[in-house]
């Protein structure tokens, strides 16, 4: 399980409203033919599209560039005054998604010629819509551009001033060298006017045989159990990496003199001297979810909570927030109905516990197509729990 954990300051959490004349800036790498249509392809069956389309939709990472851009932003945050008006990451849709959301309430114009291009064969559509990772878009007033520029140069983060906030409620990409406007739309055409999606599916009731246990077949059962990846996977032996990068890892997955991966949760300290930190855990239950999607969802939350409970949480359950990652083979008969029940089940269960689920992710293409057959994955929700730990030295280990 790879991921990150951290915290944000409350006074940095709310964005300001961009004003006409403010500058639109990009921090990070160049545009390449990467992640074109990634959002659509990621929610379609593997093998549904031609290999060229699927290859162009694949995302590539550039962690070095990510670190440079993050350090530049961190430099602004840790200054006496943070001059960033608004900020947005580049995800699916690339510049189109990121930059339009920055100026959603005002409008803006982007100079296509100033967007960094690493591949000269890109079309205007590909420059605007590619999902090259490790880029951030932000709005900053013109008088503070030099400050950001100096910080970016210090951190070796590429920085590009690519446009202006206009206040005309239009979003425009314009190339002065070509004399064309690949995109010029009213903001109301882009936000809040899309039709509602209506999904139709039917519930399929599946019946399973009762569990039959024969003690004489114990070793056969054990052999089958150890074939499960969640039980017998040996990645922890081969993936030997430094799990204490940065020096704030208070609890990682391995424990004891043999360093077996038995810990129920991870804990990151907030600083180098204090005892407070952030605890995190995960939970999933694909097998029970196959039989009953509501039970599978509730079990995922339950596992995450019974894992994180071994850390002293400052406000007990009120300290915990959940993230739901939906791994589901949608658009297959009965699966949309199962997903609806699973989402409803998580919502009702979390509300009854007084826990929020403020964020999440989905991968709805959990299906592999072959020439003569198809294989779908069991619909699963993976729950990540995080909470305020008030003493990183009192976490219980197995």
Q: Which residues does each predicted region cover?
A:
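Glycine/proline-enriched, intrinsically flexible loops and inter-domain linkers
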Residues: 1-398
